[in-house]
């Protein structure tokens, strides 16, 4: 098999990275994708750094054994703590994801920029460096959201539980002007509609899925690794939980409009 015909690997701590996979499949419809969700060990956002590194390398080894030509780490937490180590150890294009703060700043709407993310993403040096670029000129507030990925892993993406969780998180901003909300975890796009409801649709909601997918395409094109033939690609999903329910949920989220 030529390298062009090999699949692209995707990895996340659970089902969240499927939000990125959806964007990538739209952008690269001829490609085959292998997605590995580590729902058995989710969430990563409250774990120790070394544990996240070990789990990420285990997942990468699994996907490498399937013959992938590139890897997307579709997990903000795993990107923040392991992306450099991965690139040093594997000789394929490796693309990560980080909170899309730059697009939020470039909107120039005025008002507060809120970054929803896991506690670990917000605690890492990579995030601090990102904040340093803009904190002198912008009103940016990190908002840790522990527990939200676990709800989404159960398939709870709307309804009272999600509404009340988000309402509680955002109630302190009721009297403030919010220009944008950056979704700093790949699970969060699945609750975007409820988030709009809670914030009365007054803020732009931004996630990094499109930017990551565009970077994937750019790197594959520059390396002459894109599939050329006229075909429709396929998506195959694996999960460390190895039960039908989580696989069914994964495909349901992938096909969700």
From Swiss-Prot:
Pfam families: Asp_Glu_race. Its EC number is 5.1.1.3. The active site is at residues 75, 185. It comes from the Bacteria. It is an enzyme of class 5 (isomerase). Substrate binds at residues 12-13, 44-45, 76-77, 186-187. Pathway: Cell wall biogenesis; peptidoglycan biosynthesis. One of its GO terms (biological process) is peptidoglycan biosynthetic process. SUPFAM superfamilies: Aspartate/glutamate racemase. GO terms for molecular function: glutamate racemase activity. It catalyses: L-glutamate = D-glutamate. Keywords: Cell shape, Cell wall biogenesis/degradation, Isomerase, Peptidoglycan synthesis. InterPro entries: Asp/Glu/hydantoin_racemase (IPR015942), Asp/Glu_race (IPR001920), Asp/Glu_racemase_AS_1 (IPR018187), Asp/Glu_racemase_AS_2 (IPR033134), Glu_race (IPR004391). The keyword Cell wall biogenesis/degradation applies. Belongs to the aspartate/glutamate racemases family. PANTHER family: GLUTAMATE RACEMASE. HAMAP family: Glu_racemase. Provides the (R)-glutamate required for cell wall biosynthesis. This is Glutamate racemase.
